[in-house]
Amino acid sequence: MPFGCVTLGDKKDYNHPTEVSDRYDLGQLIKTEEFCEVFRAKEKSSGKLYTCKRFLKRDGRKVRKAAKNEINILKMVKHHNILQLVDVFETRKEYFIFMELASGREVFDWILDQGYYSEKDTSNVIRQVLEAVAYLHSLCVVHRNLKLENLLYFNRMKNSKIVISDFHLAKVETNSLIKEPCGTPEYLAPEVVARQRYGRPVDCWAIGVIMYILLSGNPPFYDELEEEDYESHDKNLFRKILHGDYEFDSPYWDDISPAAKDLVTRLMEVEQDQRVTAADAISHEWISGNAASDKNIKDGVCAQIEKNFAKAKWKKAVRVTTMMKRLRAPEQTDPGTPSPSKDSDKTPSMATPAPSPANTPAEGAPSLPCPSPDTTG
């Protein structure tokens, strides 16, 4: 039955395995993620294709928690740039989450297949991500694991929309903010690395990282020493993130507009209370105006993508950091120490007042108080 596990964990609401097999055929295994297996599934009555995530309870408490969390969050949200929940089943041994099927490609694959790729293409991607995130933030939902691998084209049509996936780390932000560090190291915001309480601004930082990569083919933060072990690699990486130590390097950024650099800088502001919100970023001229260049940057971006993201350590870097032990923040310098200057590379281009506080709901969205902690499951 649709949304069968109304009360997660209540034995009287367990579905029998045949309730799943009577309704759906589980087909090809698409991939194996940290907490689950992802299948392509077909609804028997209609022939429609969906994505199915299967979580095995025997894999431990973290897996069970991730499944219940993703279900609870997906039941809350409905937006055209977010993969929608279709059906849920809980048996004694498994959780099954059925969602819309995104039959398109990851953004990287799309770029590599294009004959022409410009800032305008990136602006279109970032606009859709910002709109979805502004919606989530209006509900006090923090995704906490935004990264390129979680952005998909919904189908293979030329004008396909972008959809955000993977909500097992998402959390409802309460008035006390969030203290549990998690996410993918290369996309972590400084406040997470510093083990401070944090909230919705971490998603905006991650969007800045995504935008930086899409415009240059390079990650903004990387371990120059190319340490092989994760702990040394992460320590070097985290030190750079804490200080906002990135540059608009030549020649990769030579043809990128000042407006694009300005938005990256606003999204990747080290101080979370000064970081631009998703709702405000949508009004930036690079998103809603005509500031995005239409110059073809494909050759340079693709060359760097193939160089950087084919490395084994970057393939492994999609790992998710969920345990405090893995998140060892390096020592912080004096708060008064300025971050490396990027003034020579940026030109202010948002003709709007200073960014509103980071917890401001999206424009036009209801001004909701943050729900109580028990809404997160």
Curated annotation (Swiss-Prot):
Domain Protein kinase: 24-287
Molecular-function GO term, any one: calmodulin binding
Keyword Membrane: yes
Entry cofactors: Ca(2+)
Record region (Disordered): 324-377
Xref: InterPro entries: Kinase-like_dom_sf, Prot_kinase_dom
Assembly, per entry: Interacts with calmodulin, in the presence of calcium.
Role, per record: Does not appear to have detectable kinase activity.
Protein name, as recorded: CaM kinase-like vesicle-associated protein
Gene: camkv
